[in-house]
Amino acid sequence: MRIIVLGAGVIGVTSAYFLAKAGHEVTVLDRQAGPALETSYANAGEVSPGYSSPWAAPGIPMKAAKWLFMKHAPLIVRPTLDPVTWRWMLQMLANCTSARYAVNKGRMVRIAEYSRDVLMQLRADTGIRYDERMQGTLEVFRSQKQLDGIAKDIAVLKADGVPFEVLDREGCVQVEPGLKPAAHKIVGGLRLPGDETGDCFLFTNALAKLAEGLGVRFVYNVDLKRLRRDGDRIAAVETAQGDYIADSYVAALGSYMPGFLAPLGLDLPIYPVKGYSITVPILDEAKAPVSTVMDEYYKIAITRLGSRIRVGGMAEIARFNKDLPPARQATLTLSVEDLFGGAGDQKKAEFWCGLRPMTPDGTPIIGKTKFGNLFLNGGHGTLGWTMSCGSARLLSDIISGAKPEISTEGLDLSRYR
């Protein structure tokens, strides 16, 4: 079958790879000059199934109200009268109940755990390298109240069979020796030894090369215009460079997917939640993190990527704004210097932002549409890297008519009807 994949981020490239492995003839179209040049470029670097949780959670509305008045807030909401923004935020608030949280988290953990298994098999089969580390993640808490608040998360981890360790201050320093000078600032932590880290940009580029070896054709610098329909099927992709025709089509356009598909009558509740990162070269190995340390107070992840430290986080509700305010960089710098002072060269920091494609319930949208040959793979939010391989393998099975290895319940667009 001839298949066109729209988008060459980590979701699009993994989709293309697994579709090619299944025997399909795949073409990938992207507006950028190469793979992973938008949201996949400099994310936090975590592959963290255990931390796959919806942002829409009990207590979040109250926390969000407090964050609005913090100098170094993890959430920034820019004032707007935009109806799309308000609709999405109201949908998210509707998911902030205990019952909805449990359902949504269960779906997210299902796809995330599967995705890690698929990634491990891919690594074993291909030897792909991407500054990867398999040394777990550690979430540190600065107050006893924060530490006590993880009870509901631990219950879910137990129910899902996810290995975890609750550590005291000394235990945190034992797994992350670089925390020793700042040990007095934390009270304990939650460690997930099965989590991984890695550079999503390196991974996506390496996988694109492997996909080319399977016959996948990548066409870059393409100005996508629209999908042309013929009844209940898609007939072609119209671009400024001409039409592209296939038997089936996969949309993996991240935050831009709702706008691109709206003319077809598809209503996708995916919103571009802006996140920031800085990447700094390591100055002192002894002071640097071993893997990923998540600062619960600032909602920031500090990740070791080879000879670099990636610091990523925050959430800004501002539509497609991609400004880089110095105040956001200051928050990232504050967090990493507070916990790993002197580990990285802040004078050489690379400051970046990306638009995470978020659904109001946190679960991605994977699968069929009302058009018989149009499929979706998007809305992964902050977990695109974590969920990429599993989402792609699942979608490949759906398109190929094979039986998926996990349940697809609650993962497609029909859950919003």
Swiss-Prot record:
SUPFAM superfamilies: FAD-linked reductases, C-terminal domain (SSF54373), FAD/NAD(P)-binding domain (SSF51905)
Primary enzyme class: oxidoreductase
Pfam families, sorted: DAO
Pathway connected to this protein: Amino-acid degradation; D-alanine degradation; NH(3) and pyruvate from D-alanine: step 1/1
Keywords from the UniProt entry: FAD, Flavoprotein, Oxidoreductase
InterPro entries, per database record: DadA, FAD-dep_OxRdtase, FAD/NAD-bd_sf
Gene Ontology BP annotations: D-alanine catabolic process
Names of the cofactor(s): FAD
GO cellular component labels: cytoplasm; plasma membrane
Signal found in the keyword field: no
Catalytic activity: a D-alpha-amino acid + A + H2O = a 2-oxocarboxylate + AH2 + NH4(+)
A single MF term (Gene Ontology): D-amino-acid dehydrogenase activity
Chain sites annotated for binding FAD: 3-17
Family: Belongs to the DadA oxidoreductase family.
PANTHER family the record matches: D-AMINO ACID DEHYDROGENASE, SARCOSINE DEHYDROGENASE-RELATED
Record's function text: Oxidative deamination of D-amino acids.
Name used for this protein in its record: D-amino acid dehydrogenase
Taxonomic path: Bacteria, Pseudomonadati, Pseudomonadota, Alphaproteobacteria, Hyphomicrobiales
